């Protein structure tokens, strides 16, 4: 049997100290040099052990301050289901309410953004064709739990009251309801989930370690004429969320 890598042994040691209440939630850990000296390893080994525990939500790093024992954090249940599109209210807000968490989100919309090649392919338009791009940061009790970047062809919503997803009389109503307001009926959505490591920007926004595991969901909404009318890249951190799919059964 191969020997356990040193950083995994140190991670187990740090985890054990936390379990035995040597360090409590919110406590700052000793320096890497001190931990390394106590455990007989170099600082790089301690760093890798801490990065692993940060990605698992056991520790948290604070820029310019050090590494701390993470406060207990409820893992958020993220439900994916077409049946959850409601005329009023947000599915995300419903999920958070069920967990007794305060739901909120921050967004930024840029109109008339040229579609990159991949987005153009997903929307069935020419590369460079104008789109409305909206970025979201979803929060549960003020802590980020999900990122999303949405793209809608300007040719579909331009000049209408729903051109801005988070502005106007239909602000925050969701893709299905907003499209219905301009006579576009959504028939179905296609989602492609894929595990990967977080980028540096995603890690910073989500408060997780760089390269921590996330689930990247590519979602596209289609009209009843089989036309793609919105596509989004949704990023969910594995350490903080569990993704559940509800599949309606029609009889």
Indicate where each model-derived feature is located:
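Alpha-helical residues within helix-turn-helix
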Residues: 27-28, 33-34
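Residues in the helix-turn-helix
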Residues: 45
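Short helix->loop/beta-hairpin flanking segments within DNA-binding domains
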Residues: 9-27
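Residues within the alpha-helical elements of helix-turn-helix
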Residues: 34, 38, 205
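Short coil turns linking two alpha-helices in DNA-binding domains
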Residues: 41-42
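C-terminal regulatory/effector modules of DNA-binding transcriptional regulators
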Residues: 126, 139, 143-144, 154-251
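Structural motif
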Residues: 27, 129, 148, 212-213
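HTH-adjacent hinge/linker in prokaryotic transcriptional regulators
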Residues: 2-9, 24, 37-38, 48-130, ...
């Amino acid at each position: 049997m191969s020997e356990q890598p040193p950083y995994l042994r140190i991670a187990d040691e740090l985890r054990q100290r936390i379990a035995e209440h040597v360090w409590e939630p919110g406590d700052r850990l000793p320096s890497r040099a001190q931990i390394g000296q106590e455990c007989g390893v170099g600082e790089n080994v301690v760093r890798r052990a801490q990065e692993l525990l940060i990605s698992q939500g056991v520790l948290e790093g604070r820029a310019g301050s050090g590494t701390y024992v993470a406060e207990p954090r409820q893992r958020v249940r993220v439900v994916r289901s077409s049946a959850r599109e409601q005329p009023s209210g947000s599915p995300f807000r419903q999920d958070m309410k069920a967990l007794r968490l305060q739901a909120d989100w921050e967004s930024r919309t840029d109109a008339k953004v040229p579609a990159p090649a991949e987005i153009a392919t997903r929307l069935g338009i020419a590369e460079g064709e104008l789109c409305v791009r909206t970025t979201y940061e979803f929060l549960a009790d003020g802590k980020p739990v999900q990122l999303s970047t949405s793209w809608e062809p300007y040719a579909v919503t331009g000049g209408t009251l729903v051109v801005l997803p988070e502005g106007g009389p239909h602000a925050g109503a969701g893709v299905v309801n907003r499209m219905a307001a301009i006579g576009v009926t959504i028939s179905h959505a296609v989602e492609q989930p894929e595990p990967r490591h977080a980028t540096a920007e995603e890690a910073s926004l989500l408060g997780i370690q760089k390269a921590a595991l996330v689930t990247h969901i590519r979602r596209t909404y289609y009209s009843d004429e089989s036309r793609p009318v919105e596509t989004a890249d949704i990023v969910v951190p594995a350490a903080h969320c569990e993704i559940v799919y509800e599949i309606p059964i029609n009889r």
